[in-house]
Amino acid sequence: MIRCFLPALLLVLVLGIALPVPAAPLHENETVKLPCGRTIKVLSVSRIQYSTGVMALMVRYQTTLSVEQQHKALSEEVDDVFKVAQKQVEHDGFHEAIISSNEVPHGIILTSSRMLNFIFERGADGTWTRLGRSEFMAVQ
């Protein structure tokens, strides 16, 4: 009895480890650990429609980095946020996604923060690319 059970148990364990687990959808006010090891706070996840009728999934998150300088660290962080959101974007059938980096608000009575949007577009071959500012303006 145990001899028959052990191979079956081993097979279940191997398959359980080898099969990819689908990513859970992102939720508002959720803290997410990125592949790079940083953690971010998801501010909102929403579906938006451009004036041209194109639908996209927008993920707004809070970053500790400055969005004003658009440095390499912010670019890498945005790419990591997209990697986390990509399964949800594809599952929901979108061909475009917007990742919105929002600085931590500062101020006591009047608070303010800056934000910067990054647009990702899925090509005909299924690969995702991040649009540059000039490409984004041409699409609109």
What is the role of each PLM region?
Residues 1-9:
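Bacterial N-terminal signal peptides that target proteins for export
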